[in-house]
Design a protein with these regions (language model features):
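Basic, helix-initiating cap at the start of DNA-binding domains
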Residues: 1-34, 38-50, 63-67, 72
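Short hydrophobic/aromatic patch on the recognition helix
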Residues: 49-59
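Hydrophobic/aromatic residues within well-ordered alpha-helical segments
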Residues: 19, 62, 69, 73, ...
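Short secondary-structure transition hinges
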Residues: 104-143, 150-153, 158-162
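Hydrophobic alpha-helical connector segments
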Residues: 68, 82-113, 164-167
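C-terminal peripheral helix-coil segments that are non-catalytic and often amphipathic
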Residues: 1-10, 139, 143-151, 181-227
Length: 227
């Protein structure tokens, strides 16, 4: 699924109103700090100093506001990820380290409560998030694998299609609100664990050395005799 409609998130309301992007910005801050369920339309209107009637002239429901917020977040994430991946003046190691740092920080910002609320209260929007995540993973993981193999940083004895499916299953199985709330781990900790487990098995000795020079906590070179 492409991020269809994302570019239309801030389309002006009736009469070319500039209020719509302000509503999305205010709602985003409230949703991220309190979760979706605990924020009311009255809260959003009060944050902006407008009436609820004015709010509903721009959006028909709180769910429609949520959709706009989610699509703005997806567009922002997609833009950052694409920019990192396309930095051909940097090595794939440098790009991956930057990508891990960005995604870990973004997961911490979103938090499991906000994501759980979407999963429970807005399943159609949650499916859109899952489709977006899966598609971006597939597209960018192919680029990463190709570059890593070319530089002999990744092992060549494992089928790439299998690797991609394994990585997607890991992400979907552990980087989801239900699992993060159950485990008590922060989103960043969960993401770091998934990355460590997966890439430690994928990297060649050379790849592990290159990564460890930039991310020693994640990719320490194996010591002699270590299991």
């Amino acid at each position: 699924m492409k991020t269809k409609g994302v570019s239309k998130v801030f389309k002006s309301g009736p009469g070319g109103s500039s209020l719509r992007p302000r509503i999305v910005e205010a709602a985003r801050a409230l949703f991220l700090s309190r979760g979706f369920i605990r924020v009311t339309a009255d809260d959003i209107a009060a944050e902006l100093g407008i009436s609820k009637a004015t709010l509903y002239r721009e959006f028909t429901s709180k769910e429609e506001i949520l959709k706009a917020v989610v699509r703005s977040l997806m567009a922002e994430i997609a833009g950052h990820v694409d920019a990192i991946i396309k930095k051909e003046d940097q090595s794939i190691v440098e790009r991956l380290v930057a990508l891990f740092a960005f995604l870990g920080g973004r997961l911490s910002l979103l938090g499991p409560v906000f994501l759980r609320d979407i999963q429970k209260s807005a399943p159609a929007i949650w499916r859109e998030i899952e489709d977006f995540r899966r598609d971006k993973l597939l597209i960018n993981f192919k680029i990463i694998l190709a570059a890593g193999h070319k530089q002999r940083l990744f092992r060549g004895d494992i089928d790439d299609d299998l690797l991609m499916r394994m990585f997607i299953r890991l992400v979907e199985g552990f980087i989801n609100p239900t699992e993060m709330l159950r485990s008590g781990r922060s989103p960043a900790e969960t993401f770091e664990s998934v990355i460590k487990v997966f890439f430690q098995g994928l990297l060649t000795d050379r790849g592990r050395q290159d990564f460890s020079s930039l991310t020693p906590a994640l990719f320490e070179p194996r010591k002699e005799g270590a299991s």
